[in-house]
């Protein structure tokens, strides 16, 4: 059975448009609270990013949980991985994040974490959706008796606790003293956290894009827009730059030359560091979108590599199935399960900084052992029709077959629908950049006219 509202990363959409409305959020809170209460849940932790709509959705979720008899603890603007961590340490039974991650301010979303800091499984989400569907259909929800209504409290020291957690993942014998780091917080949830983590570990920090106003989150900044970070690194002659997205669950780097270091290269750096120290546990899990260059570089070290479906939840599932520790996506979702239960941009960045200090090499040198194959990604926005119906059309299938024949064994083609937006992503990868671009545009055109 497929999920109707939960995409690859919870529920997400444009604010004020179903399902991101206060009415839906309240009913979702009630449905989730009812399901969680049936397993003994007494309290849920709610965090959010810096979008102006977060206040509205937070209040609606509060009401829904209270109606289901579940207490709520509010921690304010906080990175997604912080909610996962704090839900466990505060002994809450679940965590809720109100965020649309790297999307613009006019989008928002809602996702859940279990009390172990992992995302809810598909079965739990389906159970929540079934109750939610009833509430939406009948435009009503069943409130518990007055004496059993949930209470709400606010936690004031959550940021400090999470800062200490992040610092605790960095070895005590190492210091960032002598490093000049530019930090781009994307005007997002880590604006009051990330710069302090690096400063308290000894670095000289230049903090940019750290003044959220409710509407500037991810606005030409952060992990998805690296131009301002690249400029700042060069202007300040910094050793490197670190960019987080709006909810700080992904990270990207810029080296001292102003060159981008993406998630695939971060995975290579971390795997290489572990391999050289004899600490590599198993292999690495990437996704269908991971660059072939990563797989080839790991193969040279004898490190196994598996591809999961796109989405960090599926990377986590694959890691748990294999018992491996390291995985992630090119977009900067990095999973290091010995340190955190979910993708954590700050924690991942500290592991890269650890590799830099222990190797005595600069970031540009560490990534040099991996050669990325030219990869072209074209996002085709859908104006009509569903992604599934378009992907099933013969004309699109034939375009893919033709492109694969042209590329031969020197490349690969991947078409997939976005789990969060009305998009079909066309990815082509090969050793020849001009051929890669040509075939990607050919397939994208076939998708557009399908």
Curated annotation (Swiss-Prot):
Task: Tell me which PROSITE patterns the record gives.
Answer: PGM_PMM
GO biological-process terms attached to the record: carbohydrate metabolic process; peptidoglycan biosynthetic process; UDP-N-acetylglucosamine biosynthetic process
Please tell me where Mg(2+) binds in this chain. 101, 245, 247, 249
Sequence positions bearing Phosphoserine: 101
Ordered alphabetically, the record's keywords are: Isomerase, Magnesium, Metal-binding, Phosphoprotein
Example GO molecular function term? phosphomannomutase activity
- Reaction catalysed by this enzyme: alpha-D-glucosamine 1-phosphate = D-glucosamine 6-phosphate
Might you give the EC number(s) for this enzyme?
A: 5.4.2.10
* Family note: Belongs to the phosphohexose mutase family.
Function according to Swiss-Prot or TrEMBL: Catalyzes the conversion of glucosamine-6-phosphate to glucosamine-1-phosphate.
Spell out the protein name for this chain: Phosphoglucosamine mutase 2
Which organism is the protein's source?
A: Shewanella sp. (strain MR-7)
């Amino acid at each position: 059975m497929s999920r109707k509202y939960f995409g690859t990363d919870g529920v997400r959409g444009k604010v004020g448009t179903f399902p991101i409305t206060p009415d839906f959020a309240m009913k979702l809170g009630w449905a989730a609270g009812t399901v969680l209460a049936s397993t003994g849940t007494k309290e849920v932790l709610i965090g959010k990013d810096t979008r102006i709509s977060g206040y509205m959705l937070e209040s609606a979720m509060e009401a829904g949980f209270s109606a289901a008899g579940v207490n709520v603890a509010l921690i304010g603007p906080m990175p997604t991985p912080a909610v996962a961590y704090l839900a466990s340490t505060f002994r809450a039974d679940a965590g809720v994040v109100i965020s649309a991650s790297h999307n613009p301010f006019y989008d928002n979303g809602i996702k859940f974490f279990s009390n172990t800091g992992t995302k809810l499984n598909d079965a739990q989400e389906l159970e929540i959706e079934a109750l939610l569907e009833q509430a939406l259909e009948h435009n009503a929800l069943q409130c518990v008796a007055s004496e059993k209504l949930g209470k709400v409290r606010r936690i004031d020291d959550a940021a400090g606790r999470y800062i200490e957690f992040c610092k605790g993942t960095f070895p005590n014998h190492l210091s960032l003293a002598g490093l000049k780091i530019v930090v781009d917080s994307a005007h997002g949830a880590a604006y009051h956290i990330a710069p302090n983590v690096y400063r308290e570990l000894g670095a000289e920090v230049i903090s940019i894009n750290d003044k959220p106003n409710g509407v500037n989150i991810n606005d030409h900044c952060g992990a998805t827009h690296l131009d301002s970070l690249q400029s700042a690194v060069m202007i300040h002659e910094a050793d490197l730059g670190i960019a987080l997205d709006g909810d700080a669950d992904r990270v990207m780097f810029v080296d001292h030359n102003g060159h981008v270091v993406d998630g695939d290269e971060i995975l290579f750096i971390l795997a290489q560091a572990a391999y050289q120290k004899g600490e590599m546990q198993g292999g690495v899990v990437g996704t269908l979108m991971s660059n072939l260059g990563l797989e080839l570089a790991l193969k040279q070290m004898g490190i196994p590599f598996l591809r999961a479906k796109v989405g960090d939840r599926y990377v986590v599932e694959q890691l748990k199935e294999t018992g491996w520790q390291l995985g992630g996506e090119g977009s900067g979702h990095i999973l290091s399960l010995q340190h955190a239960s979910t993708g954590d941009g700050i924690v991942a960045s500290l592991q890269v900084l650890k590799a830099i200090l222990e190797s005595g090499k600069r970031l540009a040198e560490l990534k040099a052992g991996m050669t990325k194959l030219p990869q072209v990604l074209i996002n085709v926005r859908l104006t009509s029709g569903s992604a599934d119906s378009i992907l099933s059309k013969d004309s699109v299938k034939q375009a893919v077959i033709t492109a694969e024949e042209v590329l031969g064994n020197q490349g690969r083609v991947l078409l997939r629908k976005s789990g969060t937006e009305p998009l079909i992503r066309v990815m082509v990868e090969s050793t020849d950049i001009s051929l890669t671009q040509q075939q990607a545009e050919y397939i994208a055109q076939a998708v557009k006219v399908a």
